[in-house]
Amino acid sequence: MRKYYSLYGRLLDKQRLHEAFRHVKRAKGAAGIDGQSLSAFAENLDAELSRLLLELKEKRYQPQPVKRVVIAKAGGGERKLGVPTVRDRVVQQTLRCILEPIFDPGFHPSSYGYRKGRSCHHAISKAQLFIRRYDRRWVVDMDLSKCFDTLNHDLIIEQFREKVTDGSILHLLRSFLESGVMIGVEYEKSSVGSPQGGVISPLIANVYLDQFDQHMKNRGHRIIRYADDILILCESESGARHARSVATVYLEETLKLTVNMKKTHIAHSSAGVKFLGVDIHTGFTRIQEQKVKTFKAKVKQITSRNTGSNLDGVIRELNPVLRGFVNYFRIANCKGVMKALMRWIRHRLRAIQMKQWKKPSRLHRRLRQLGYKPPFKWIKMRSWRNAASPLAHYAVPNSWLHDEQGLMDMAGVDVGFSVSVI
């Protein structure tokens, strides 16, 4: 195994720091505990990078604690994020660019999370392949409790030391791990974990969990991992139970992680295997119901009839949400779901337009402009039911919403495809 001795000098390059900032800026993100935004950092970019470079050269650089941010999970519960300052993100990104090419080529081939050229679609397609072509239809869905928050610092450094012997790099890596967390005005030490939200945390997690990947491979088990989402695909139920036992022992005893046995399941693909937002069945893949509910909640928020925006503005805000949803879930067999969702969305948009017209006379004028002849039925303009009436469809036809207003049509996107397995 090749060892890397002198890497710290690669950090001491202003151009590298500048490229790292460009990456951090593209990723966006909130300010850390110092309150400095990306735009404020950019205003004094040369001075900020010069100061960082000097601190790194003199080895005076010390990361600041991350800012605790709590966000709600779609399925309930909370996710704790740690937001580093902009300057710390720049150093982390530079460090990541140095270390990633050293470790990534050796990762398990079925590891897909946070790796260049790999995606959720590749992971799902690999699971489909194992289930449908290789008859590995008994699947263990491993659930790790607070994986990122419980990574053992000594084991992290030990893993990096296998290839990196530069003490200054390892010291810098540990300083990020031990920088602590600010929860409001209270400081909390960080004796374990690598906070979600850190630029280098995904690489740390992949290096850490690759030990598990390789252990399972050496034992003859087929796995697919995306970050801390793990599937073990087996030929029989007894094989799945054995694989679960092997995995649990290694994860808990060697890697010091906690397997949530209540959420770790063994399932046959005929009943559906939950993975990365989809249910993978023996013959088809569908979107998980919770993901559809979360999507509809977002659409409802944008298309509230109490919105102050006109229909043009609503559609402009809505389109990126529709595009993101269908682009992710197009790997599923979801043509019917997309058609039903578009009918529901158009109904909501018609309800907005009807309410903004306020008076039936405006509706009737619109119908006459489109060539319809009176008399027209007098209807309540604020009624949700009437937004589905024939008059509403005549006045606000599908073609007008899509062709003239530019509403993205999820039902018009090809779905049910698989990407090439890598």
Predicted regions located by residue number:
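N-terminal alpha-helical targeting/anchoring segments
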Residues: M1-A47
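Conserved polymerase palm-domain catalytic core
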Residues: E48, E55-V70, A74, G106-G272
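Extended C-terminal regions of large enzymes
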Residues: R348, W357-I422
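Short, solvent-exposed helix-loop connector elements
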Residues: S111, K189-G193, K300-I315, G324-V337, ...
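Core structural elements
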Residues: L12-L17, P65-V69, A74, L177, ...
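Duplex nucleic acid-engaging cores and interfaces of nucleic-acid transaction enzymes
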Residues: R87-V91, W138
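A glycine-rich phosphate-binding loop feature that marks nucleotide/adenosyl-phosphate handling sites
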Residues: T264-A271, E317-V321, M338-R346, S361-L370
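A conserved non-catalytic segment of reverse transcriptases
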Residues: E178, T254-R323
